[in-house]
Design a protein with these regions (language model features):
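C-terminal charged capping/lid subdomain of soluble metabolic enzymes
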Residues: 183-185, 277-352
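A glycine/threonine-rich phosphate-anchoring loop and its flanking beta-alpha core
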Residues: 15, 113-203
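Short glycine/serine/threonine-rich phosphate/pyrophosphate-binding segments
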Residues: 106-113, 134, 246
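ATP/NTP phosphate-donor binding region
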Residues: 1-97
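Generic secondary-structure signature for well-ordered alpha-helical cores
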Residues: 58, 159-163, 168-175, 183-195, ...
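Solvent-exposed alpha-helices and their adjacent loops that cap or buttress functional pockets
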Residues: 92-94, 117-118, 146-147, 154-158, ...
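Active-site segments that bind and position negatively charged phosphate/pyrophosphate groups
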Residues: 198-305
Length: 352
């Protein structure tokens, strides 16, 4: 088991390893002293792990209540958020009680935002069950729901009390969902760690789960510790995301987040090569490694539709847009471009 300490406004530990769900009651009791726990999950994850977690927490002395919703991004809405707040109030949760988010990124984002706002803030614990959530969304305190106008447009920075990444849960993931998480794993190598990217290129999907997840969490820790509120270098973690969010929205969220980010990284790296910011060999290597992991390389969406959807992104500021660009493996930067130039960037990335 690997332990990583996150030193932000609220310090907490991230544990990565096998069998953590079996010990969740003891580990949660160390940080949450209240009487009641609300387990928030989607219907898919609940069917796999919900009853076992509920029993473990009940046996550990907690009064457990649960809230589930249909799996998928389409549930990360004001309506689901409102129902969750009502559930917490109706079950009498107080500020000394705790929410446990059991699931992927949608579950963590929604449960975290409810924790941040219910009674002006109660404790919550992240138990991510997808690779993507383990290496990205469960760490760093970003919580949010979607609005009709765009993704993650209502949210808060609110750190969890604990994160438990049980690698055993990865065995139940559909292949496509696991590969989604690989897009975020590869992002860390491209941004920060050429040695990690070399190892992933060699090992492919056989990579050691605990080692790689732990390394990604360490890299995320470094970014979050330096810039908790996403005003500077933490923005590098958005590599591929501005275009990726545009692809997700333009595709009516029928394209998964990981697949969209993978396409976003391809498009931006190709555009960087076309604009002279990186060597074409760098863009081609990124594409080749994404290919090794079976991540998509094409979209039938045109540059205009992607751009229109991307312009609602939070990284827009007036008539400019912040775009994370790749100059080399391990060397990325934030470029501010006019919003009317974004379509040309996307077109350049699509046309190569």
């Amino acid at each position: 088991m690997k332990s990583i300490r996150i030193s932000t406004s609220n310090e907490y530990d991230v544990f990565v390893g096998s069998g953590l769900l079996r010990n969740a009651d003891r580990m949660i009791r160390n940080v949450c002293r209240g009487e009641t726990v609300s387990i928030v999950s989607d219907d898919t994850v609940w069917a796999l792990y919900g009853n076992a977690l509920e029993k473990a927490l009940s046996d550990g002395g907690y009064r457990c209540v649960s809230f589930t919703f249909p799996a998928g991004e389409q549930s990360k809405t004001l309506q689901t958020y409102s129902r969750l707040l009502s559930h917490l109030a109706e079950n009498g949760l107080t500020r000394s009680d705790c929410i446990v988010a059991l699931g992927g990124g949608v579950v963590g984002d929604l449960a975290g935002f409810a924790a941040a706002t219910y009674m002006r803030g109660i404790d919550y614990v992240q138990i991510p069950t997808t690779l993507l959530a383990m290496v990205d969304s469960s760490v760093g305190g970003k919580t949010a729901i979607d609005l009709p106008n765009g993704k993650n447009m209502a949210g808060a920075f609110y750190q969890p009390k604990l994160v438990l990444c049980d690698t055993d849960t990865l065995a139940s993931l559909p292949d496509a969902v696991f590969r989604d998480g690989c897009a975020e794993v590869l992002k860390y190598g491209i941004l920060y760690d050429p040695a990690l990217l070399d190892a992933l290129e060699e090992d492919g999907l056989r990579f050691d789960r605990e080692t790689v997840i732990g390394r990604c969490v360490e890299l995320k820790r470094d970014a979050v510790t330096a810039d908790e509120y996403d005003r500077g270098q933490r923005m590098l973690l958005n590599f591929g995301h501005t275009v990726g969010h545009g692809i997700e929205a333009a595709g009516s969220y029928q394209i998964s987040h990981g697949a969209a980010v993978a396409m976003g990284m391809r498009i931006v790296s190709r555009a960087c090569a076309e604009n002279g910011l990186c060597a074409m060999t760098t863009a081609k290597r990124i594409a080749q490694i994404l290919d090794i992991f079976g991540l998509p390389d094409t979209t039938n969406l045109c540059a205009e539709r992607i751009t229109q959807a991307a312009l609602s992104d939070k990284k827009r500021s007036g008539n400019t847009m912040r775009l994370v660009v790749c100059r080399d493996i391990g060397c990325c930067d934030i470029l501010t471009i006019p919003t009317n130039a974004l379509e040309n960037w996307i077109r350049a990335g699509l046309d190569l």
